[in-house]
Amino acid sequence: ITIIQGDSATGKTTLINMLRQAENLGRSSGVDVVCEAPCRVLEGANWKLLLQNMHGNIIFTDEENAFINTEEFAAEVRNSDNYFVLITRENLYNLPYSVEEIYGLHASGKYQNTKKVYQQMYQIYSEMLPCQSEPEKLLVEDSNSGY
């Protein structure tokens, strides 16, 4: 999962529109998508049915689709063999994604560029000590993992 963020007027909606045109009109759209995997836009009321019939695609969707924040969507993403690019400024608490896969979309003059939002990481737990006994149960909580 990759997340693309950005302020208004940075090209997020334009990216989705261009991908949609390329998908619907092919070469006559004037948009040339260079990618080894098919790139698809997921949107609309039938999103779940469409997603269940897509395999091995790169799927783009944006925050205009209300389903992006639902547990139902998160469950479908977790059970899918597709790669997802989600364009949103919201936190997606139901989905597991890496901070290394959050990109910002920013405009520079008349050109749009992507840049990593979080460029450095540090290890939170630097040393793992061996456990002297086998626990019967291990409880963990991670609200951002989606589980």
Where do the model's predicted regions map?
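Conserved P-loop NTPase "ATPase switch" module shared by AAA+ and STAND
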Residues: 47-71
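RecA-like P-loop NTPase motor core
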Residues: 96-147
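Hydrophobic anchor at the beta1->P-loop junction of P-loop NTPases
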Residues: 4
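Structural recognition of the conserved hydrophobic beta-strand(s) that form the central parallel beta-sheet
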Residues: 60, 82-90
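Conserved glycine(s) of the Walker
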Residues: 10-11
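Post-Walker A helix-loop "phosphate-sensing" segment adjacent to the P-loop in P-loop NTPases
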Residues: 21-31
